[in-house]
C-alpha cells in the first residue's frame, strides 16, 4: 500500500513551531501523457525541509509530500513518451528537484512559475517522501552507473546547488584557483569540495569541528581552519596556508552568511567573488565599505537550471564522483527514525547527506 509523508498542521507562529510528520495512505498514481511513473527507492533531506517544519520557508503545504531529492526505478510510461523515455523503463533515475527553470544561466525564465518541489504549493503531488511519483519525462536523468539508489537520492539539490555556485557563478572552477568552502559538513559544501578537487582547484574549507575538517582533508581539501577555536583570526590562519605563488583566495562559496564578507576580505583577492547559496546564520549579511573599495563581487545563487542539472550529472558520471552519506534510515513508515535525521540537521551533527531508504 503506497504512503506519502507530509507535515501535520499545528497552530503556532513561524519560527515558534515544529510541525510533526504525518504518514498517509494514498492510491498508486497513473502516469499522464509524456509522464513516467517512478517507484521511489530513496529520498534525501535538505536544510529547507528543516525550515519547512518551522514554517520558515515560503509556500508551505500540508498536502504535498516532503523532500526534494529522490531516486527510483521507472516502472511505467504514460502515453506519448519518447523513444528515449522508453529506454528508461526498468532503469534507475534521479529526478530534478525544481520546476520552471530550463536553461537561462541568469535565473529562471519566469520566476512566477519557478519553485523547488517537496512540501510546498502548488505541486501537491510532487515530493520524494512517497512510494510512487509520476513526473514529466524531461524531469529525470539516468542514474550514473557507479552510484546506488542511496547515493543517487543524495545528489539532486546539493549537487545542482554546488555545481551552479562553483561553475556558473564563481567563474573560478579552474585548475590552480584557490577556493574556500565554508561550513564543511552539509551536502552542498561537501559536494562543492568534491567538484573543485575534480577540477584541479586548491580547495580550502572551514568548520567548527576538527573531526569534520579531518574528513574534508581525506576528501581532498588542501587546507582547513576551525572558525570556533580560532574565531578571532581564522582568516589570518587561512592566509598562512595559501601558496606563495598565489597568496590569496579567488572565490568563497558560502552557505551561512553572517560576517563572512568581513572575514574573507583579508584573504580575498581584489575583484574576488563570494557566492552565497544560503544564510543559516540569519537573513541579513554584513557588507562593509572595504568590500566595495576592493571590488569584491557578491553573487547570490540557488539550485540551477535543467541544463545545469544535466551537466552536473554528466560530470559526476565522467569523474566517478560519489556523494558523501552521513546516515540512512530504512522505511518511510519509520517516522521516529526519520525525526532522528532531522535532529542531526538541528544539531549540525551530519557530515554528508541524510537519506531515507524507502
Swiss-Prot record:
Pathway: Secondary metabolite biosynthesis. It is an enzyme of class 1 (oxidoreductase). GO terms for molecular function: oxidoreductase activity. Pfam families: ADH_N, ADH_zinc_N. Induction: Expression is positively regulated by the phomenoic acid biosynthesis cluster-specific transcription regulator C6TF. Keywords: Oxidoreductase. Its EC number is 1.-.-.-. PANTHER family: DEHYDROGENASE, PUTATIVE (AFU_ORTHOLOGUE AFUA_2G13270)-RELATED, PTHR45033. Zinc-type alcohol dehydrogenase-like protein; part of the gene cluster that mediates the biosynthesis of phomenoic acid, a long chain aliphatic carboxylic acid that does not appear to be essential for pathogenicity but may play a role in allowing to outcompete other fungi in the environmental niche via its antifungal properties. The polyketide synthase produces the long methylated aliphatic carboxylic acid chain of phomenoic acid. The cluster-specific cytochrome P450 monooxygenase may then hydroxylate the methyl group of carbon 31. Belongs to the zinc-containing alcohol dehydrogenase family. Quinone oxidoreductase subfamily. This is Zinc-type alcohol dehydrogenase-like protein YogA.
